From Swiss-Prot:
Protein keywords: Cytolysis, Enterotoxin, Hemolysis, Host cell membrane, Host membrane, Membrane, Secreted, Signal, Toxin, Transmembrane, Transmembrane helix, Virulence
Protein species of origin: Bacillus cereus
Alphabetical GO biological process terms: killing of cells of another organism
Domain of life: Bacteria
TM annotation in the entry: 232-252
Principal place of residence: secreted
Cleaved signal peptide residues: 1-31
Gene name per UniProt: hblA
Subunit comment: Composed of a binding component, B, and two lytic components, L1 and L2. All three subunits act synergically to cause hemolysis.
CDD domains found in the cross-reference section: ClyA_HblB-like
Protein name: Hemolysin BL-binding component
InterPro entries reported for this sequence: Enterotoxin_cmpnt, HBL
Function: Cytotoxic protein, part of the enterotoxin complex. Responsible for binding to erythrocytes. This enterotoxin is thought to be the cause of the diarrheal form of gastroenteritis caused by food-borne strains of B.cereus.
């Protein structure tokens, strides 16, 4: 029997996504009388390059969601005090509700969806731990020709893979629901924002010049956020000293983001009731709109990851079939074909674990703050 793991695995709810299949590792040949097996049928690890790219996308998505949600909460309440909206008596109420909806989505991200995303990273960490605990026993089983122990180990690992695939799909469904809900609200918010600007301009408010200034500041925020992401991309390259260059880029980006905060604070100050109202509504709309766009990329990435979990499940099923076939042979070395892939998988999961842990800590840094509900 295979040696059981000396610790209690996390609850099934933490065994989520983020692994892929189709690793490229050396093709091993069966010992005497054993037919040659295609290496793709016996892979036990993820495609490391694709996995790193997927982890990176997940981290950048979470960082963007944190930032835009934070700005939604920090943005002042919409206030129509002292402003008359003739002919559209329900518009103030609609826009107040738009802001409430946007903040509710930010809270959903922070209290529910972000936790599920963190659990996807926990899933890869825990899978590496499980694989590591099974490794020595499976190597011994290969060396002694113990097919039953090998099958039990692969079957146990496959069970965790299936759980990860299942919960990956649930996360995709949750993100899709959030995207659809936000998409509906963004369209309504955008329509109400445009109508408000038209009304304010007709009342003589100089919102055009201020709107241009607002867009410049928000554009700068997005630019430096992208620059910071580019620096992260460079650091992930990890070749020819590029991590140092990437670190400089990230440092510059963070400095500039810090300098932009006073500009955002300036835009939040009351100058003229009508202009200030336009600013507050514009900032709220801009952030919820950016969240809407970020969700599309996240769903695409997670769909890819879910598919790869499914493919990895198929790979392990194939490995079980090869073990069954090899077990019919009399040679004690009949399972040696698995050892190169077992060794490659051990190293690969360890590398991916490191990336997953790093991203987990980064994602947890920012908590969306509560806001006093509007009356």
């Amino acid at each position: 029997m295979i040696k059981k793991i000396p610790y209690k695995l996390l609850a099934v709810s933490t065994l989520l996504t983020i692994t892929t299949a189709n690793v490229v590792s050396p093709v091993a040949t069966f010992a005497s009388e054993i037919e040659q097996t295609n290496n793709g049928d016996t892979a036990l690890s993820a495609n490391e390059a694709k996995m790193k790219e997927t982890l990176q996308k997940a981290g950048l998505f979470a960082k963007s969601m944190n930032a835009y949600s934070y700005m939604l909460i920090k943005n002042p309440d919409v206030n129509f005090e002292g402003i008359t909206i003739n002919g559209y008596v329900d518009l103030p109420g609609r826009i107040v509700q738009d802001q409430k909806n946007a903040r509710a989505h930010a809270v959903t991200w922070d209290t529910k969806v972000k936790k599920q995303l963190l659990d996807t990273l926990t899933g890869i960490v825990e899978y590496d731990t499980t694989f590591d605990n099974y490794y020595e026993t499976m190597v011994e089983a290969i060396n002694t020709g113990d097919g039953e122990t090998l099958k039990e180990g692969i079957t146990d690992l496959r069970g965790e893979i299936q759980q990860n695939q299942k919960y990956a799909q649930q996360l995709i469904e949750e993100l899709t629901k959030l995207r659809d809900s936000i998409g509906h609200d963004v369209r309504a918010f955008g329509s109400n924002k445009e109508l408000l600007q038209s009304i304010l301009k007709n009342q003589g408010a100089d919102v055009d010049a201020d709107q241009k200034r607002l867009e410049e500041v928000l554009g700068s925020v997005n630019y430096y956020k992208q620059l910071e992401s580019d620096g992260f991309n460079v650091m992930k390259g990890a070749i020819l000293g590029l991590p140092i260059i990437g670190g400089i880029i990230v440092g510059v980006a963070r400095d500039n983001l810090g300098k932009l905060e006073p500009l955002l604070a300036e835009l939040r100050q009351t100058v003229d009731y009508k202009v200030t109202l336009n600013r507050v509504v514009g900032v709220a709309y801009s952030n919820i709109n950016e969240i809407d766009k970020a969700l599309d990329d996240a769903i695409n990435a997670l769909t890819y990851m879910s598919t790869q979990w499914h493919d990895l499940d198929s790979q392990y099923s194939g490995v079980l079939g090869h073990i069954e076939n090899a077990a019919q042979k009399a040679d004690q070395n009949k399972f040696k074909f698995l050892k190169p892939n077992l060794n490659a998988a051990k190293d690969s999961w360890k590398t991916l674990r490191t990336d997953a842990v790093t991203l987990k800590e980064g994602i947890k840094e920012l908590k969306v703050e509560t806001v006093t509900p509007q009356k």
